[in-house]
């Protein structure tokens, strides 16, 4: 998975949507969910790498007992790490920002594709955290999910820029 910043901390691509933009602006959520719908394919197909496997081996040997990560992709758990603290959350679960209802991300993909078939056909370059590089689109027709319980805003359980831990 690509990262947002280079080794010197400089942005490598356009800055992602902030928590404040996501919460305040419907069009920001439309942009987010259209890009996330396209980029989700990359998240589902991502596999743990040698570094993930090495950390599992260190855990099995008792060298480490807990892993704290800023990664939001769940690859440490998929590799077999058992005691993982996802400091920045996970993108494979969602929460309603009004009532706290929890949702798995995978079924939402089907909903997004069913309600937005014109976006489902798009191809985009891989970007961090389930995002895709598909700028210069009109997102105004993108149907986005609301909480099935209260109608509130649904957001991935990951820290966005400007969000709090």
Predicted features along the sequence, with ranges:
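Conserved catalytic core of sirtuin-type NAD+-dependent deacylases
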Residues: 1-165
